[in-house]
């Protein structure tokens, strides 16, 4: 019997451990809040550390860079360690990271703390799909992933506004101390409910290349890069577009972004249902819809009310993306889900950097409308690749 068949049989026999799924979701909430906090606290952080805002902004860059590297190396490095302890270690790293940032006397110490957070983020996401496969039956994987990614949506919605508000009230250092609390609770909860999960495959760097060589994997990773690049190019320059084209006020921009966050949460919540109906169609239609939205923004972006609607629909559509591609990973390579997860994390982190950087170059040449046009092209290309070059297996049905 092949290793793939063994893995699939093991998955099907798993009894759902929903408390463990929710404990991981709480840990994810803490990780994502910590990741996005600097964006809303950049000015006071820079002033306190006596550096420029540009230098303080490297706190975000450092996290993304180390997350990319960690996603690729975490499986080989921890190949002999019980996954229960590895996952809890990521919660410990988030706690240490937040406290290091909170008490950092210099930018160097702050960046070191952010590097630890990058290890936790890259490591967790590379193992998230493989862990989910071992916590719930195959038919329930989309639902479990939707729960975990719902925590991402909630964290994304609350991190920036709550961080900005609390930073003004209690100071940015105290905000990072509070940020450690969800991970403390998550760590204790995980200690209580996470089962022992011995490594099921011997991960190595060679395994990454073997997984990538499987039919449809390169197409899937390329589609992922295009979708995330298109999204982050669009989202990074959304505010300048709203302020210059639609002449939206600061309050109006905040409301539109809130609408995005709420719709994103709803999209994530219903992702499991839609993906279980037709995985390939969902993976293909989402970037197609997003490309149409980008084009409509370019054509009718001067109407603020319409922009609010289009951005909300974009948020809903993008809510399906992380769950969708994690589900694709779980159904395509269940026997090497950790190594494949590392490739997915690296692809996403690369896409985030490329989307923001490439969008910046286009923005300087042709403004936000040019960025949105380029974003639409990337997303449309992703749809074509999903249909033509991605191997998709149907999601198991929950009888």
Q: What residue ranges belong to the model's regions?
A:
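Helix-loop-helix hairpin linking two adjacent transmembrane segments in secondary transporters
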Residues: 107-109, 138-192, 241
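A late C-terminal transmembrane helix in Major Facilitator Superfamily
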Residues: 332-368, 374-375
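Helix-to-loop junctions at the C-terminal end of transmembrane segments
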Residues: 70-82, 267-279, 363
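Paired small-residue
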Residues: 97, 108-116, 305-313
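Helix-breaking motifs and short loop linkers at transmembrane-helix boundaries and internal kinks
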Residues: 50, 82, 103-109, 247, ...
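Cytoplasmic helix-loop-helix junction between adjacent transmembrane helices
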Residues: 113-151
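Conserved MFS/SLC helix-loop-helix module at the cytosolic interface between two early adjacent transmembrane helices
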Residues: 69-105
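C-terminal transmembrane helical hairpin of 12-TM major facilitator-type secondary transporters
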Residues: 281-325
């Amino acid at each position: 019997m092949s290793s793939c068949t063994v893995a699939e049989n093991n998955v099907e026999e798993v009894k759902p451990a929903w408390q463990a799924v929710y404990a991981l979701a709480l840990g994810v909430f803490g990780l994502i809040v910590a990741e996005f906090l600097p964006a809303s606290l950049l000015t006071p952080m820079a002033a306190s550390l006596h550096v420029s805002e540009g230098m303080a902004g490297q706190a975000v860059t450092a996290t993304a860079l180390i997350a990319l590297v960690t996603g690729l190396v975490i499986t080989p490095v921890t190949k002999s360690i019980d996954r229960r302890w590895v996952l809890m270690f990521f919660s410990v790293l988030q706690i240490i990271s937040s406290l290091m940032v909170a008490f950092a006397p210099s930018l160097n110490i702050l960046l070191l703390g952010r590097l630890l957070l990058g290890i936790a983020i890259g490591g967790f996401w590379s193992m998230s799909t493989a862990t989910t496969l071992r916590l719930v039956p195959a038919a329930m994987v989309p639902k479990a992933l939707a729960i975990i990614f719902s925590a991402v949506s909630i964290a994304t919605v609350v991190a920036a506004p709550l961080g900005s508000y609390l930073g003004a009230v209690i100071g940015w250092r105290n905000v990072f101390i509070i940020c450690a609390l969800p991970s403390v609770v998550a760590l204790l909860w995980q200690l209580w409910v996470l089962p022992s999960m011995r490594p099921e495959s011997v991960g190595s760097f060679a395994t990454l290349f073997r997984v990538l060589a499987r039919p449809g994997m390169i197409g899937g990773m390329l589609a992922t890069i295009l979708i995330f690049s298109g999204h982050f190019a669009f989202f990074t320059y959304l505010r300048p577009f709203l302020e210059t084209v639609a002449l939206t006020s600061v309050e109006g921009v905040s409301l539109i972004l809130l609408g995005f966050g709420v719709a994103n949460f709803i999209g994530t919540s219903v992702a499991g249902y839609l993906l279980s109906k037709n995985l390939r169609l969902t993976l293909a239609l989402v970037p197609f819809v997003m490309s149409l939205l980008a084009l409509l923004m370019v054509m009718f972006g001067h109407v603020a009310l319409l922009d609010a609607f289009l951005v909300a629909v974009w948020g809903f559509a993008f809510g399906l993306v992380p769950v969708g591609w994690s589900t694709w990973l779980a159904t395509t390579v269940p026997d090497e889900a950790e190594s494949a997860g590392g490739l997915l994390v690296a692809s996403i982190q690369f896409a985030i950097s490329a989307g923001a950087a490439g969008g910046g170059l286009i923005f300087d040449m042709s403004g936000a409308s040019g960025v949105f046009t380029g974003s639409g092209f990337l997303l449309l290309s992703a749809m074509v690749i999903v249909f033509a070059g991605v191997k998709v297996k149907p999601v198991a049905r929950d009888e």
